[in-house]
A protein has these predicted regions:
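Long, low-complexity, compositionally biased intrinsically disordered regions
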Residues: 1-89
């Protein structure tokens, strides 16, 4: 499990890319709503109770189409940010 100190350092790095989504992702990760399945696959329980599948290589299957994309085309929604924080990336 990632410590809150380590998460805060990671969050500082994520905010320029994902903005408020990084903060919401930190809330999800800190509240234990992120679960590792296998390999690059994770499940994240969203704020409304829906469960989203996040693939570290391909992104999240949620409908947040306005989330910013990185150089690889991965959308940085709050669920993806939560997984990045939980995984210590």
């Amino acid at each position: 499990m990632t410590t809150r100190y380590a998460m805060s350092q990671q969050l500082t790095r994520l905010i320029p890319l994902a903005g408020f989504r990084a903060v919401r992702g930190a809330e999800l990760a800190a509240s234990g709503r992120v679960r590792h399945l296998a390999g690059p696959l994770w499940l994240v329980e969203g704020s409304n109770g829906a469960v989203w599948c996040v693939d570290l290589a391909a992104g999240c299957d949620c409908p947040d189409g306005k989330a910013p994309r990185d150089g690889n085309g991965v959308r940085w929604c709050k669920h993806y940010c939560a997984v990045m924080l939980a995984a210590g990336k």
